[in-house]
Amino acid sequence: MPSSQPDVTAELRSSAGSGRRPRVLVVDDSEVIRQLIAVNLELEGFEVHLAEDGLDCLDRLESVQPDAITLDVVMPRLDGFATLARLRGAAATRTLPVVMVTACAQESDLARGRELGVQAYLTKPFDPAELVRTVRSAVFSGASVFSASASRPDGSYK
């Protein structure tokens, strides 16, 4: 029986008619988190590239030419907010969609992310399906889809 759901994987593979899969640069200092994000995005048709920290991200931008970035905040050498500020300060990456995926869940962190122009802010632990939906939306909308999924001190989500 045919599904009434749209073929999202086919949509992603066509990447808005460009003939290639959308590229996501996953930036996190934890190899486990990088792999978790990568596997979930690859299963949904994204081409995934990995970076260990903000400097590694900036070094890979030209060769990868990502359609979006997932970015942790707390990383060695160059943290996520400093990386994001550099991305927003360069004409070529000023509007590049960025989804923060981090354990930093304070209101001040969310506010700083908004000020720097992130499309979404997901906190760890995150729901892989929500991550995929959020990245897909950021890639295909091109506009801010700011959402904040931040855990409360009791472990529930806002």
Q: What name fits each language-model region?
A:
Residues 75:
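Receiver (REC) domain active-site loop signature in two-component systems and cognate sites
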Residues 64-70:
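Active-site beta3 strand of CheY-like receiver
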Residues 35-43:
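Charged docking surfaces used in two-component/phosphorelay signaling
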Residues 126-136:
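C-terminal output helix
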Residues 119:
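Short, glycine/charged-rich "phosphate-handling" switch motifs in NTP-dependent
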Residues 45-52, 60:
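Short hydrophobic/Thr-rich beta-strand motif most characteristic of the beta2 strand and flanking loop
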